[in-house]
């Protein structure tokens, strides 16, 4: 109970300290609508490098105020950034050091290691066939979902949905949706069985 009270006090302090950033971002949104993300980019970059617990709560307060739905029980570590206002992050989620979250829904108790990239789908800069064929390249942003209780290892790249209770090994690239309750590793990420210290790929 005491710990929760302290967390809420720090949460409020974080909001107060980040008020200038919150006000500037909301004003940009009111004036420019969905296209207004320049101030958002500036603010998230500045706040990402504020150190110590002060920075953690300033980032939390800022994203709680300007994003679609951010739990006050989430944690944003040093260097972490959220790229889009419509991102949602559940209670107990930890956004690791230098992790970037794109257009995503992050479930409760999701843990990310350092340097994880949760990007907005596979086609942000067009499809390969468009580029190879010399066609006009159309940007496309897809919302990705990471299910609750999943753990994503250091430097993993997530371009598709991750089910609940999953483990994504460090350095893996999730290119296609992966079902719940599995361990995945590699580039592209594949499901593996880990028993007695041995790894066997599942077909």
Describe the function of each predicted region.
Residues 67-68, 86, 175:
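Alpha-helix termination/capping residues and helix-transition junctions
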Residues 54-61, 78-90, 94-162, 187-202:
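Flexible, glycine/small-residue-enriched loop-and-beta-strand segment within the central core
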Residues 160-185, 202-203:
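C-terminal/domain-terminus segments
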Residues 1-68, 72, 125, 149, ...:
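Terminal amphipathic alpha-helical/low-complexity segments used for targeting or macromolecular assembly
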Residues 65, 101, 173-174:
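Structural motif
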Residues 68-70, 106, 146, 162, ...:
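Hydrophobic beta-strand core residues of beta-sandwich domains
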